[in-house]
């Protein structure tokens, strides 16, 4: 609706006339409107009567509906005439609680917090805390800290799980002393000035993660405590890659093309100018035309996920207020009709309490551990340096571990071999887009001893030794500016913001001169300039260390629970996961860990998952066609003593269940009785269809996943490994087309006519240019001697940089009757390469090559880029 209004405001026409449809401006508007409201919404411009109605037209339309009265018109005019300009005031003092002496109260609580942590006698901590308190007092931020401390203290007393920290507030010792965060900033080398810059007047931003299943209780507390509370509106825009995706969807451009081009760019500017996108822009020029018109416009509105504002007086006195449906409920909640920055400018106090599912998982796991083992687990008291936990992460067993389970992160942890929290925090910074391809390569090489650790000056060693001399964090940029460049910490924070956000170049040059001048006292001017250039090049990828340490702490907590209490942890994951694909991954992981996953049964299952003995039992609601409501009806009516009894209940009128539900129960073995015996073949064939669960009979080593490509990223060119269930096989003369399915999608791959692959089975498949070279059933991987499995199992590769390993050599006959082959090679970086062996090289390759061995090759390329075998050296 807002975008629609914007369009009307751009080119509004008072009346229709004969030039209406011919107007170029209106034609432009029509096209944009067709994009926004056409095709996917079945609405086109022609269905709208877009012009400003005259009084006569409005009157006529209302009279036809029998609702027109003269006072409607006159009252509307009267109200309109009463509307006056209203200047939004800024910088108001709207803190909801007026403490008599907030600074003293804050200091008393903080010092008691230090004492409780056994740090009150440590002069380093006391001095740092006093320094922070002075800044807070000077900025008059004390009441804000007391409000946040009160909220978090209440939540913890109520047994609501609160995160260890989030964002730059984890760098504050005051927040640690107040128990707002659980991260010791001195121990981890975190900076208060990254959180609050004394030269900035903006309010501090303390972000807090709250157990998502109980976040509403925290909001209710704020309403009870401070009365005037509202959520914050968000305004979503058409921008960057989203514009390309939205326009492409409406223009029915193939999703495969869209996904391919969006992997090549990050911004709209890159899309419009990069040579790598030329092919897409030439093929679909209208995407850029419409995208330019839409970029920056409002796409929709929402409610801020974490932020609420509070005030000492009714909020509507200072800002527009509306009510909206609360996400996930039928209740309507008050929302300020401005965004977060505008709310802060007015003086409304923003409190960030973000619901985080991981905290609900941890809370549920701890509760089940206490119930099953009579042990009270406090995450703040567990051993944070347990080598077994870090070894599990380094082996790639990351499924369910907070932030670490995505494939790129898992791959990074395997490459790194993390051994402590510092390295886990570094991984949190390195996994960010761009970081791994820049500073990350040096970090890994230095960590593994392949590159010498060096420092521009010894002063840098103090704060970069943990990262092997690499500048990964924004805090390290700030420390270099202070300790090497002689700048103030306030100026250093400005440098961080300027470099990271590419702000005003003139201001940037001023600080560059300051840094080079100061650093030249320690190093040569050209070295100082080079170091600044490195900051400039890498700062866009550098990360907030405070946030990295806080979230890595949360990652470690989940990893620790997974290692020591796998049953309770996996149950908690499943209980809190609503996404079926993710839940499927967790079920597969549970089976890999040796946790029996019991199929549902009408007499034994609850609505959702439950722990049963040493295993996890499926809930009835996980079955296709069975909702929570239907599951409850069955549970209320059980036990059923026979299939006939179950059938009679299902078909009894008024019970609210149907034959589809009964059939699904039967197919998955959930309706097994003496008069309806279990059919294992039916169950195997229907696991995916009915439970969304592929059949994985054996554990798959976690490091395999580093080499497995998801089907949504499938490319018909190249050599790679996929894993999926065979959904169907279409046989034809000379070939078979095998449709393979994983959690991201499906793809058709070609195999020989007499393929040995079976439907319903899950395979590890080596693909070369859209052909299957080898397919190993997952339940046969453990005993397989194939070259592919050997390669995947190597921890140390048994060949040199000059050699390449033969993963697969598959001969075939050309149409002319000549012999050629598809060859898949692996290098020491573990990358796979697709190589074509033409008839001229076939005899030599056939005689010399053996799968599972390494050789020195001479490779070439054809004009179309196909890699070909030219010679085998030795």
Could you tell me what each predicted segment is?
Residues 1-86, 202, 326:
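Alpha-helix N-cap/helix-start capping residues at coil-to-helix junctions, especially the first residue
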Residues 16, 22, 32-36, 40-46, ...:
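Noncatalytic, beta-rich nucleic-acid-contacting surfaces in large DNA/RNA-processing enzymes
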